[in-house]
Amino acid sequence: MSRFWSPFVKDLVPYVPGEQPKLARLVKLNTNENPYGPSPKALEAMRGELNDNLRLYPDPNGDRLKQAVAEYYGVTTGQVFVGNGSDEVLAHIFHGLFQHGGPLLFPDISYSFYPVYCGLYGIPFEPVALDEQFQIRVEDYQKPNAGIIFPNPNAPTGCLLPLQAIEQLLQANRDSVVVVDEAYIDFGGQTAISLVDRYDNLLVTQTLSKSRSLAGLRVGLAVGHPDLIEALERIKNSFNSYPLDRMAIVGAAAAFEDQAYFEATCRKVIDSREALVEQLTAKGFEVLPSAANFIFARHPQEDAAQLAARLREQGVIVRHFKQQRIAQFLRITIGTPEMNQALIDALS
């Protein structure tokens, strides 16, 4: 702590990101990265930007990427916001749409950045307990609030809330912004973007870090009513007018345009997930239903923290959370078949 800090800084509880180990031989199943590389067309597009134009600022609006997203989802560019990773997009949402005095609602087991944003922006919040099966109960969100946000599929559980239930939640909260954080939606869910034309209080966020294999590029987006998008643009242009560099804009746009590669890699991850669930179940693990590129599992005879430590000793890294309700679970990223087999071998 320094005497130069602003008073609020000492009270912040920052987000703790997943470990990024430097040892190349480790099997990394802890941060939900895609085990398959980016679209070759995305790489080609980015290489095309390695020229003298790097002396120029990028398009502050990211219009090429907005157009690609709009065409992909059948919306207008005025319904699309793009930013430097979905975490930045979420930060702008918290800053611009959730500061209304009342409590923000989100699941008690959820993305751990949500309470961090609340602390940063002084937003009161109320965690809403998942049920015994770690599912969201829509009826629990039918109470006064200043906004609602939840991941779908949820993180770190991987459980999916059906589109019909999301619509029920929207109908019950017409005067609140409802944000559906769809970082993992492409691995088994149906996007809520299909609802944005019917609900002016709906905002859907996505990332290119997972299903499009561009975690190192830092690109995120939001789709919603133009009034909500305008609020995010106002926040962005009061903070950083150029959040995406020239390579990020063209690379992300090309990734959206390469539908065949996207579908093929998602299919491989889904198939590997189902195979890994079967293998872990055979070893006595309880695995929650997952629509994500990870699974959430526990073993009735193993302490999760100790198991994670023993796996690391054998060169396999998974994610353990200390939160009491899930302290006996491990979150395991879906890797290639070879990476998943390394996990099974280590468990054996």
From Swiss-Prot:
Any one Gene Ontology BP term: L-histidine biosynthetic process
Residues with the N6-(pyridoxal phosphate)lysine modification: K210
Keywords, in A-Z order: Amino-acid biosynthesis, Aminotransferase, Histidine biosynthesis, Pyridoxal phosphate, Transferase
Co-factor(s): pyridoxal 5'-phosphate
Pathway noted in the entry: Amino-acid biosynthesis; L-histidine biosynthesis; L-histidine from 5-phospho-alpha-D-ribose 1-diphosphate: step 7/9
Catalyzed reaction equations: L-histidinol phosphate + 2-oxoglutarate = 3-(imidazol-4-yl)-2-oxopropyl phosphate + L-glutamate
Top EC group: transferase
Family annotation (Pfam families): Aminotran_1_2
GO MF term set: histidinol-phosphate transaminase activity; pyridoxal phosphate binding
EC id: 2.6.1.9
SUPFAM superfamilies xref list: PLP-dependent transferases
PANTHER family (UniProt xref): HISTIDINOL-PHOSPHATE AMINOTRANSFERASE, HISTIDINOL-PHOSPHATE AMINOTRANSFERASE 2
Protein family: Belongs to the class-II pyridoxal-phosphate-dependent aminotransferase family. Histidinol-phosphate aminotransferase subfamily.
Subunit note: Homodimer.
Protein name: Histidinol-phosphate aminotransferase
Originating organism: Pseudomonas putida (strain W619)
Gene: hisC
